[in-house]
Amino acid sequence: MSDTDTKHWIATVPFADLARRRRTRVEVGDRALALFLVGDRVFAFDDVCIHKGRSLSRGVVWQGRVVCPAHQWAFDPETGRAEGRDECQPVHDVRVVDGVVHVDPRPRSQEEI
């Protein structure tokens, strides 16, 4: 089964918009997601931080990590793992097709990461 068969891709925002702002919040079904541009790659997290419940989309990318604005926990954009902690922020698969960012609204399982 191919990647396109197992994922539920939802179009969100034009890549050009994300490239200008470097981060944004999107609603995908009943989930709020935070999209970040780290280098030339797009990453998606659940927007609500696992620690204090703040919006990650208001955070920043610093040294290749997504940093929460509430408490400065730094998350690995690939895995969602909080630096120096055992907790993981839920992450989502992302692709860019024809200049539009698509995400799978279902978080990846830890086994997939």
Task: Please report, for each region that a protein language model flagged, where it lies by residue.
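N-terminal pre-ligand scaffold of iron-sulfur
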Residues: 1-63, 77, 81, 90-113
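Short helix-to-coil "ATP-lid" hinge immediately C-terminal to the conserved N-box Asn in the Bergerat
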Residues: 74
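Short cysteine clusters
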Residues: 49, 68-71
